[in-house]
Amino acid sequence: MPASSLARWKRWLPGAVLLTFIAHAAAPKAPPVSSEPPAIRVPVWVEEEQPSSPAALRFEATINGRPARIAATQGPTSDLIVLVVLDLTDDISLIEPAKQALIDNISRLPANAWVGVLRAQDGLHVLADPNPDRKPAVNAIESLSTSGKPGLFETLDSALRIADSMMRASPVRVAVLYLTDGNIYNYREDYTNPVINSSDPHDLSRRFPEALVIEKVSRMQETLASLEGPLFIAHLHYRTDRLNEAYQNGLKTLADETAGEAEFSRSPADIPDSINRMFARMLSGSSLTVNLPSEARENLQVKITGRAGDAEARLYWRSRYVWKRKAKSL
């Protein structure tokens, strides 16, 4: 990673300082005054069998139908920070192949891709700060003990705020990858929506046992709409009961909200391929810094196009944001 990029965000380390920032960022505060035009970061992928190089594309953007200036482009070969969040509590026969696939992918990353490792149990904890040296990340993964309750729901907001802080501090791409085996029944909070009136056959809680999960996901989706880093989720254990299917659909909804992805492995053999695809996707993305028009509203609809000569590329990008004025850095 270029020294200039590192210098801008290295002050977030060590992890204790980083988590202190998250607590600070969650507190209400007045919008900062900035001389720079407000902007959002839009993740973009070229979705073609033989894609044009993003460097060869001429990107254009509109926000709520109005032209918007693209101030900067970070392509697939630009600096990348991957924040791996481990949320592993269950079957060791699934966890071990997942840890090995994770280590293999980290070892293959290019030199300008840095990896940090966090744990989601009992709050978000930094196990290895983002670093070009792979050893701290690998050691953290290998030594991880698997116990406790699932923590994805409780830590997701904080993890994505870390990603936002890094993107505001330096012109790098940042992605958040959750590796999880969570079962909705094992959360500390009860999402089972128990029957309120057992003597009433028409009690709605009988008909909609997944209502609490859906409500939780809806609230989280609105929070994620104001955060800009893409979210990737590799779930090690697809479950078929009604409540876990609602939970798994909710995880996919949250990843889709950020233009990331969620995959659910149905067998141990699926796990390495799923993690491989997640890393390939994170590496292949671009990030556009798009200035907001002066009349931009809170709810933003974004459209990105890319052309190579007269041909228009097939793109996938994040299209919905809720914009809230943010400080560039602390």
Regions found by a protein language model. Give the residues of each.
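Von Willebrand factor A/integrin I-like adhesion domains
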Residues: P230-L283
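Eukaryote-biased intrinsically disordered, low-complexity acidic regions enriched in Ser/Thr/Pro
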Residues: A27-L88, I95, K99-D104
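Second-shell loop/turn segments in exported
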Residues: V85-S93, D104-N105, D122-A128, A140-K149, ...
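Von Willebrand factor
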Residues: G75-D129, K135-T180, I184-N186, R207, A234, ...
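Bacterial N-terminal signal peptides that target proteins for export
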Residues: P2-P14
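C-terminal "exit" segments of structured domains
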Residues: V33-I40, S267-L330
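VWA/integrin I-like adhesion module and closely mimicked acidic/polar interface patches used
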Residues: G182-T253
